[in-house]
Design a protein with these regions (language model features):
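An alpha-helical appendage that flanks or caps ligand/catalytic pockets
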Residues: 1-15, 55-164
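Short, well-ordered beta-to-alpha junction loops that form the rim of enzyme active sites
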Residues: 4-7, 31, 171-173
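A conserved active-site cap/scaffold subdomain adjacent to cofactor or substrate pockets
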Residues: 32-61
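Hydrophobic faces of well-ordered beta-strands that scaffold small-molecule active sites
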Residues: 26-29, 44-49, 81-88, 167-169
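Short catalytic/ligand-binding loop motif for oxyanion handling, primarily in non-cytosolic enzymes
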Residues: 35-36, 57, 93, 175-178
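Aromatic- and glycine-enriched pocket-lining scaffold segments that form the walls
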Residues: 8-9, 13-14, 18-31, 37, ...
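Glycine-rich, proline-tolerant flexible connector loops at the mouths of alpha/beta enzymes
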Residues: 51-54, 170-180
Length: 180
């Protein structure tokens, strides 16, 4: 269990138990730079959302690995030296089709920020799609993994140059039909 300043919870028997020996690598879900550095200090992998641009990616990758080298006190069986980013992946035959789909993906981000940021949701009353359609919310991150095969390939090469260890793709985001 845990008894802390801000919250407490009773001990639980977590099932299923990992059968792998040693224990599988540990990861921390990270939403900002400080949580990425916390993962490095704990000697575990950092799983984050996409960054704003490749320069920021490079800075965060370098900060993670520098902190890992200098300060890591592993909490697991071994160090998991990986920074991974979650990104949307939608491959389209043309730039115009990608732009049309990209707007629908932005709705997913708008919804995410609504529920975990600024929103005041009222079930049965709040229409996120209507609110999004009327909003002037600005999306400041790169969407290079939404586009033509050439654009996506170029984006992945930039992530590679920035030193990113892994990228995890999500294809089910936004107001997109199964056929799309």
């Amino acid at each position: 269990g845990y008894d802390g300043v801000h919250f407490s919870f009773a001990a639980r028997n977590v099932l299923p138990k990992p059968q792998q020996k040693p224990h599988p690598p540990l990861w921390l879900a990270c939403s900002h730079r400080e949580s990425i550095l916390k993962a490095a200090r704990l000697g575990i992998g950092a799983l984050s959302f996409g960054f704003t641009n490749f320069d920021t990616t490079k800075q965060w990758v370098e900060a993670y690995h520098d902190t890992l080298r200098r300060e890591a006190v592993p909490i697991g069986y071994s160090i998991n030296p990986n920074l991974s980013v979650l990104s949307r992946l939608i491959c389209c035959p043309s730039d115009s089709e990608a732009k049309r789909i990209e707007d629908k993906v932005h709705f997913w981000w708008y919804s995410f920020v609504h529920y975990f940021g600024y929103g005041s949701h009222k079930p049965g009353v709040t229409s996120l799609w209507d609110n999004y359609s009327k909003s002037d919310y600005k999306f400041e991150w790169d969407t290079g993994t939404i586009g033509t095969p050439e654009k996506i390939s170029a984006t992945l090469r930039e992530y590679e140059r920035a030193g990113l260890d892994q990228i995890v793709f999500s294809i089910e985001a936004g107001n997109i039909s199964h056929e799309e």
